[in-house]
Amino acid sequence: MASSESNHPYHMVNPSKWPFIGSIAGFIMATGGIYYMHDGSIYPFLFGTALMLYVMYGWWRDVISEAENGLDHTSVVKHGLRVGMVLFITSEVMFFFAFFWAFFDATVPLISRTAHEIWPPEGVVPFAAFGIPFLNTLILLTSGATVTVAHHKIQHGDRSGCGRWLVYTVVLGLAFTALQAYEYVHATFGFTDGIYSSTFYLATGFHGFHVIVGTIFLIVCYFRTQKGHFTADTHLGFEAAAWYWHFVDVVWLFLFVCVYWWGGSGYIPPNSNYWK
């Protein structure tokens, strides 16, 4: 039996409790969220979220442990992990494709008969594209450059330099999130105020969630770098984080151009001659 197990390059996964607990956490999160949306208590949703975070921590801790023992993650397994990350990002692209479809369905008459003749709809005051959104664009583009520098540093075996540039990237990610939160707090429209606000918050909010996840991903990479988990030849976890961060950058460029810039370009102040 031992010889047959070592006669292939695949990782035979040990029994794990995390898939089962994760499914329970997902169920509690979903039902708790629905319950809260129908004027119920938010605590079931928060409990499900906390349980899911615990599962994520434990499961990823085990994966990192498997990677560090030097036996489980063969070249074939690493190739599979890379393919899995690419497919995961592809599935995320489909998510955002749906949000952009909803946005253009509401704005472009050539696509939908239900599209608004005036966009943004009358009464909606959109954000100035070249205010906070443009600043956030510069921040994310800069963070894309800093994470690339960090990648080059680890490729050359410079763990100290990699950690330093990762810190820069994390700080930029936190700055983006803070500015996004400031923008939401000072918005003149709420999520349920119409099709404009719904598509706006869905698209930008989902992206903001990805920025938070990506920032956490990079923070984990920083601590793994400090512990010596990454070398010039072996840093798959860092590669996955960098790919994810670049994906977040690209999505934001589309959001800035389509939702903020083009989507808000038709706004006419109420005191202009158009409304008279």
Question: What name fits each language-model region?
Answer:
Residues 1-276:
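...captures the hydrophobic TM-helix bundle architecture rather than a specific catalytic motif
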